[in-house]
Amino acid sequence: MPRSQKNDNFIDKTFTIIADILLQIIPTTQREKEAFTHYRDGMSAQSEGEYAEALQNYYEAMRLEIDPYDRSYILYNIGLIHTSNGEHAKALEYYFQALERNSSLPQALNNMAVICHYRGEQAIEEGDPETCEVWFDQAADYWKKAISLAPSNYIEAQNWLRITGRSKIK
């Protein structure tokens, strides 16, 4: 039984029903419908913390999906899972791939900045101020790009940029 038929909560069930209706109405190929079904099942599994199942669905969606814009969101979600699992290098790779296909993903840039900031914090704990500055500068670059795409978002990042003197665009 597909995951989409196992949804227990009202919102997921409603979303699934609406998505199924739209898939029937909108003229798309069978391949596109299958890709969307795997993407939707991946999101459902991911929201329940079933990351292995989510990844299987996302990889299958990637195999089927040909639209770069749609692929960007699949790649972004794969990046989220790797971030949640603490696999930051892998997560960064997927965020980069998502941005290559869709440069208007401020959430990917924000997540990349958060990872770089975290690595900067780790460098502080390890007593390596030079490496810390490199990571913080990289985080600042990503946050500035994210903020330029979504100026009313990322208020904490905007404050951090001001406080650390990194708010000026290079």
Curated annotation (Swiss-Prot):
<dbReference type="InterPro" id="IPR011990">
    <property type="entry name" value="TPR-like_helical_dom_sf"/>
</dbReference>
<dbReference type="GO" id="GO:0015979">
    <property type="term" value="P:photosynthesis"/>
</dbReference>
<keyword id="KW-0150">Chloroplast</keyword>
<protein>
    <recommendedName>
        <fullName>Photosystem I assembly protein Ycf3</fullName>
    </recommendedName>
</protein>
<keyword id="KW-0677">Repeat</keyword>
<dbReference type="InterPro" id="IPR019734">
    <property type="entry name" value="TPR_rpt"/>
</dbReference>
<keyword id="KW-0472">Membrane</keyword>
<keyword id="KW-0934">Plastid</keyword>
<keyword id="KW-0793">Thylakoid</keyword>
<keyword id="KW-0802">TPR repeat</keyword>
<feature type="repeat" description="TPR 2">
    <location>
        <begin position="72"/>
        <end position="105"/>
    </location>
</feature>
<comment type="function">
    <text>Essential for the assembly of the photosystem I (PSI) complex. May act as a chaperone-like factor to guide the assembly of the PSI subunits.</text>
</comment>
<keyword id="KW-0602">Photosynthesis</keyword>
<feature type="repeat" description="TPR 3">
    <location>
        <begin position="120"/>
        <end position="153"/>
    </location>
</feature>
<dbReference type="Pfam" id="PF00515">
    <property type="entry name" value="TPR_1"/>
</dbReference>
<dbReference type="InterPro" id="IPR022818">
    <property type="entry name" value="PSI_Ycf3_assembly"/>
</dbReference>
<feature type="repeat" description="TPR 1">
    <location>
        <begin position="35"/>
        <end position="68"/>
    </location>
</feature>
<comment type="similarity">
    <text>Belongs to the Ycf3 family.</text>
</comment>
<dbReference type="GO" id="GO:0009535">
    <property type="term" value="C:chloroplast thylakoid membrane"/>
</dbReference>
